[in-house]
Curated annotation (Swiss-Prot):
Required for interaction with TAB2: region residues: 8-311, 441-534
Organism of this sequence: Bos taurus (Bovine)
Record-annotated active site: 271 (proton acceptor)
One Gene Ontology term, aspect cellular component: cytoplasm
Activity regulation details: Activated by the non-canonical Wnt signaling pathway, in which WNT5A leads to activation of MAP3K7/TAK1 and HIPK2, which subsequently phosphorylates and activates this protein. Activated by dimerization and subsequent intermolecular autophosphorylation on Thr-305. Other cytokines such as IL6 may also activate this regulatory circuit.
Name of the protein described by the UniProt record: Serine/threonine-protein kinase NLK
Source lineage: Eukaryota, Metazoa, Chordata, Craniata, Vertebrata
Amino acid sequence: MPNVFQNLVSCKRVFRELKMAAYNGGTSAAAAGHHHHHHHHLPHLPPPHLHHHHHPQHHLHPGSAAAVHPVQQHTSSAAAAAAAAAAAAAMLNPGQQQPYFPSPAPGQAPGPAAAAPAQVQAAAAATVKAHHHQHSHHPQQQLDIEPDRPIGYGAFGVVWSVTDPRDGKRVALKKMPNVFQNLVSCKRVFRELKMLCFFKHDNVLSALDILQPPHIDYFEEIYVVTELMQSDLHKIIVSPQPLSSDHVKVFLYQILRGLKYLHSAGILHRDIKPGNLLVNSNCVLKICDFGLARVEELDESRHMTQEVVTQYYRAPEILMGSRHYSNAIDIWSVGCIFAELLGRRILFQAQSPIQQLDLITDLLGTPSLEAMRTACEGAKAHILRGPHKQPSLPVLYTLSSQATHEAVHLLCRMLVFDPSKRISAKDALAHPYLDEGRLRYHTCMCKCCFSTSTGRVYTSDFEPVTNPKFDDTFEKNLSSVRQVKEIIHQFILEQQKGNRVPLCINPQSAAFKSFISSTVAQPSEMPPSPLVWE
């Protein structure tokens, strides 16, 4: 273990690793090696089956129902527990607490961003006394939170990992910057914020907390706390890790389970892609990044924006300039991801939206006029000018040995050109291909079922929906930036009523200054502009 004593962060990490190795040594040397691996590579996908609950050496996700196994609680150091309690009481900097869950090594931060520089890491670990917001609402009872490293960029915001000073758990902190630039961005952020607080589903990322806003005159950014996930499907697909058919089934099951819930709420995600499917070290998957999500428009005469969906996962109706689309666009994206999980490469990897459409018709054949009824004239003309193509769907069997008859059958129901004939999330979940994924998820991964001494007690509803739907009528009455700012400010304060001690960021810390200056989405992450058909 080189460079152990470079700074406080590396010291702590190595000490934690040594203690965990010593603890895991009681179970097996292999387990210690497996743990070490966790720091330096993507989280190894453990086969998703029963032993998770029974082997403490498998890192349970901090947010999971069995967050800390009784055995683990007993063996994690009493000093750390005391420190966490003292810190919560004395409002110490959260960087000092040691949650049980190991964080990745500095320099190994997941996500496109590099780890924060060493001095920032060190600053994050240094003790900072609680800083009372001069404009805060509860100055006497507020805890500071410190960002420690960037872990990713969404469509509209930066995400850092932090430690919650109230319980020492590692969580993710999303910064929504430049919220109040104009009315459009205000509305979009308010919609995303309301969605994050509305969602109550294990396969959809939701807000655990929102940081205390300053006085309204100083209110420019919003910080949302969510569960911290170790990886995402993009990192897993491009990694050398083998993916068993069990993994594919359990991932696809969870994507569709989350999507059925979103669609039941009347929400279109509009940017389903592997990078927006977060995965923790137990293979639990959550759909995230609702920066582009919106409520489904049932009035066909109302136009919808085409600034959606990363190109490779973009449904043909959007590529063809349709002004009205349904939640079937999300199912198309899932079909592309399903094929990518099987073949470990992007299914339709085109250089431009026109080429994207051409690759789709190469596979599906030339669509009928009926299937193109919502397309704009220029797009139809492009298809009709070209040669007539026959479908070549059997090529999907060559994706991998896991592309079985059942897998390809379900895939072909998702990759249908005509959105009205594409399978729904609800019907896809009833497909026999997903039976094993459902069983695996509910026997050892979910929070909705539980084990007793006599066996497993299953929930009455494996794939729940939401009632009532998400209501976006609040947007109709938003007319000025100042008005929305006041409404959002009030909304955040209401979310915190009766909640735990409010959290705020310590603006004096170096890590915070780095977080503040971190940029929004990298250019490559932004969805490309839509094609303008002549």
